[in-house]
Amino acid sequence: MPPAGFGTLRLDDIALLFETGDLRIRVLPLDERVIRLLSPDSYGSMSGLKRVKAAEIEETARRYGLPDPTLFSVSFYGLRERAPFSPEELTLGSRGRFFRPIGFVPLSSEWGERQLSQRATAIAIVLYEPGMALLDDDLVVSYQGASTRAWAGVAKALERERSAVFARAAAAGRQ
């Protein structure tokens, strides 16, 4: 596990962003192996979010029998008035398996409405089954026929940053 506080990546560097006709979707992994590579401020923000919502995450995971769920922050942004969204249809593919959302911890009131005004955003922490290869480059995110394979580029950036984080931490330990 990389040490926290030595990363330089921004949230946009690890977020997957794609559009359907009505929506812009942003998917951000909350796995510690990934967020520890963020800049200290961004890491603090993401780890703080997980900490603040820990009880709700744990309760949702327990309700669905998931001892160690994979967490993502997911945002749906309305590109037109009354844009419908169905978060249950946001699937992730990894190592030949498809993962559907198991549970949701809403972060905005719009999440439960399943419809967005133009320029409105619905955000939640989405729980998936464990078993995704987040450090591999084969993660595919799909929603209603649209998908992105941009994770391949993110995975390369994560690998470079992981090496740099360990080097920076080692150098800091020698001072």
Predicted regions and their residues:
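Conserved functional micro-motifs across diverse proteins
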Residues: 1-175
